[in-house]
Amino acid sequence: MSNRDSANPPGFNDAVPLAICYIDSSTSSHDEYLTLLQSKVSAPDKNFRDETVDGAPFLAGDAISKGHRYSPPVRSDRASAQGLLQQHLEKSSTLENLKRYSSTLLGRQNDAVIDEPFAPFRPPPRVTLSESRRDRWLQGLSDPMVPLSSLIKTIPHGLWGEDILRMLVKFRVPFTRAIWFIRCAGVNEARSFLRKVQTTDITEWVKNWTDVAAGFLISFISSFLNADIYSFADDYTYLLKLFGRLLAEELVSPKHFLLRIVSFSGDSSLKSFSLHFFALQFFSTSLIQYTHICRKCVITILQSYQQLIVDQPANLLKFSLLSKKVSHFLFTLAQKNIESFFFPTEWDKLKPTIILLWKDFPNYSTLLSIMQERNSKAMYMYKPVTSSIRFLQIISCLSFPVGWRTLAKDLFKLLPVYTGVPLLLHWCINCRSIFSGDRNFIVSSIFDNANFDRNLIVDLTLSFVLKLHPLEYNECVAAAQLLDHLAACGYFFFSKYIARLASLGYLRESMLNSSFMDDQRKILVQLPILRMSQQLKNKIYYILSKGNYFVDWSICDEYVKRFKEDHFSFMFKKEENYAIITLSLVKIASTPMSKLYEDYLVMLFAFHYSMFQVMTKLIADNLVHFSFQSCACQTLFFICSVVPKTESQKLLLNEMGKLFQVELNFSYDSPDVNLLIEQFYEITSYESNYDDAFVEYKDATVANRKDFIEFLFHNITVSSKHTAVIFTSDLLMVLKIALNHPPYFDDLATTTFSSLLKRDECTILSFFKILQFYGCKLLSVDQIWAVVSDVYEAQDNNTTLKQFFNYLLDESTWPEGYLEERHWRSILCKEARKHDSGLKLFKLGIKLCTRNEQIMKTIWSFIHVHDCNVISEVIPDQRFLRTLTEHFMIDLRQLDIVTCLKKALVTLDEFSAPLYATWLTTLDDDELSELTDDVVQKKVLESLDNYKSGIWKLVLSGLPNCKTVFEHLLLFSLEERLDLPAAFLQDLIGASAYVMEQVPDSWFLEKLPCPLTQSLQSFSHLSNHIEVLDSTRQSRLTFLCHLILHMHGFVELTDQLATLESLTIRKCIYRNQELLDLLLFSIHLVKPNVETNDEVCNTLKAWENIESRPYTIDFPEALQQYSPRIVLYEPTFW
């Protein structure tokens, strides 16, 4: 015992412990302190005998006679060092040093290798039990009051894989005890696996177990349709929580498990999607950690949601609730990991769905703009098409409503303004297309939202017009419509046009009869002169008179008279002058209308001839006395007021605005359906438009809406009155909107459509009924294809289908008039180009129809802008495809193959080149034998003197040796001293992408690294002291970066990283943000990813943790020798 009365050693209270001195010192190093601590590790905590202090008293005689006792270091055993330490800890330098020392200590502790526990781990044994004893054991496991120490002796053998998970769900074992059981069984299985395969790597075993566990969860979700909803919900919740614990305890491979769950694709039902989405939402915390899995999750959710929208689930309330959850989940995911929304190849398809889901979030546009920027930058890199073709595909396949500002930004990123605007104008007047009703509107809308100077667009348009020669009639009319529309929008001035002709000297007497002026007169004679000054009219008349061009304006009065006599069958004469059409419509619009349908037809004609903007301008200038509201409304229905006065008018305005690509947003409450029908009767004056049977039915009380709608569909089927078909279809459309798209509507529409196709013959009236169905949004392109394919498979002769396709593809067989049906037919053909089902519909139509001249023109118009692969898919008959291309491209038959190729490379445009490539695919090997790799490469290089951007790639895409030619050109372009055009280098990027998609040849990959490295080093040397890169060098660097991006997945290109990184610090590079982004993106993708060993898959540590303790590495250093295996645990767990 210590003597409490003895005094402290002299000077004890003044002494300061060594550790405190070091902590308090502002000059001491924490490394010195750690060295000191390491030197004292072996020193015991207490010295029971200190020779320097307690040795002297043993020598004294008093100690011999009375005995020795040690001097206590403190006055009392209850003494505290608090006061001694507190005065030092209050100093700021002391706290700062303590923080540094502690951080260093903990860091070294984590890096230290911890010795294995003194006792080797022995997994608990398993015994073979009968089924009844096994069930009793599992019941004991599920009872928290049964200690695990009693269960560990009789762990049942044979429970593993899906069986162990099924039993845990069945007996509702608490999660901590369930994890213990899985560990006990799993560690035995793992050791058995290691003994069996004679290895120490358990990676394969962990992945197999993860695959089985994930498969059990997926099969459980798939079994929902045959399960009780309440028991299934409990089991599903338990199972998700159990898998959450398995992930947290590292008993499954996280990446492998999450990838399996994300990749699961059940049926397209609402229930299956809900369960799958709930699982993804539950594991979202783990998903966010792996960007590539998270990206796949986003794509899976969006694609499944798109399919749900197409299938139109019956329970709209549940679908609405699920949509809110999906939108919130994706929005949160984008905020936490925006990299998961980087999927350039899928962006175009999934972007509309993202906008639909996020439209209610107030700040989603900022997030969407970031995604749009990243995906659009990388989009063309992954798609092997030229910028010009990509440009044309975007504007040819627009789906309304359109985000015009984003569209304009994307388009002019693909092509500069000096190239993009002429191509846009060329697309607008392309005479081969029959779908030109809204092209002028698209062009002006893009101009309105592009950040370009208006004078620049005027100059580019003027230059484009002066280069138009020679022109066909349709192109002249289209050009006149375009110029008239742009003039009304302020993007063209006829006075500047005439002044430019005068400044170029073409208005001199000697030049007025030149071939150039003959081409210009073809356009001038079509121009309306209503809004021109008298001086300008006189100049145009003078120019026209020199070429013997005259316009007979008296024809306009004859057209007005014919319209008043029979507006249903009224049509303008084929190849009528556009100026006469414009003046005739203005005169018709200026006379009072006796029927609302006449107003409607005037609006329809205005849309058909792209005169909406012109008509509005004329009304505003008081040049036409016409209902301004009716014109400004721009709808296809019988509404004469922009401000809707009834619920039916609101519905009609909102729906029909889509037809003219005008967004008319009106807020309205759900109307009373019976009242809506009454208002519709008042608008349409049904007594004179409907059959007698319908009038009688209308007077009856509409007690059952479904019966009433069934009667309307039946009335369309049997009706022989054209007006009855029109107005009944319109009423069905209104009811569909008012009743919130009831599910039986689509069934009735498809059944009616099918009955029309299954008749003995398809009359023109039956075909018009189908067009009315499509125009009134009762049928979609997908539904039309589904019905047509079913009828085609069910019938043998398909006579009705042949008549249907002949009417669809050959408008010349129609009777005069029927402008509304002609309009719906052109809209249907245009929409079919955008859908896979639409392409399949045309493919079947081309197979069944009669191939006359008019049908061949329609097919020729339909396949424009598509690449040769799509064209070959739509028209698989190679003989007919060759006949079609040679019929419209006469030069193909008159020249030898090499001369024809040479001419195609310098004369074809973006519209004709894919068709030439399609023709090449129809030739046999003998005909192509002269087009060897060397010959084709030589002809391409010869065309550089008269280079047309992107044309050579489109032309060569039809050759069987296209990839090989591209590879030769890529290697040729890497030579150091070549001065290639900038546009050609840009086009080589598309060739590189094509080679990447087709998988490059081995000989090309062997030759590529050396010239690529030399080209990069040469570029680095040349740009060392340059302040600003010219266009050629920018194009070369862009090409080199894209070549690396495309090929790094096939060949090792890490040797180029050093050169790429050195370029990022050059002034001429980092001042160019676009080039810098491209370089950094290239470096990021090419830099090798260092694969870290996955501890979950490589070690049994998580499985041997039977006591469910934290890892020893997480304990403080003082507790590392603590062994929990020899400690008794609380009885609530064991």
From Swiss-Prot:
The keyword Nucleotidyltransferase does not apply. Keywords: Activator, Nucleus, Repressor, Transcription, Transcription regulation. The keyword Nucleus applies. InterPro entries: Mediator_Med12. Pfam families: Med12. Its main location: nucleus. GO terms for biological process: negative regulation of cell-cell adhesion; positive regulation of transcription by RNA polymerase II. GO terms for cellular component: mediator complex. One of its GO terms (molecular function) is transcription coactivator activity. Component of the srb8-11 complex. The srb8-11 complex is a regulatory module of the Mediator complex which is itself involved in regulation of basal and activated RNA polymerase II-dependent transcription. The srb8-11 complex may be involved in the transcriptional repression of a subset of genes regulated by Mediator. It may inhibit the association of the Mediator complex with RNA polymerase II to form the holoenzyme complex. Belongs to the Mediator complex subunit 12 family. This is Mediator of RNA polymerase II transcription subunit 12.
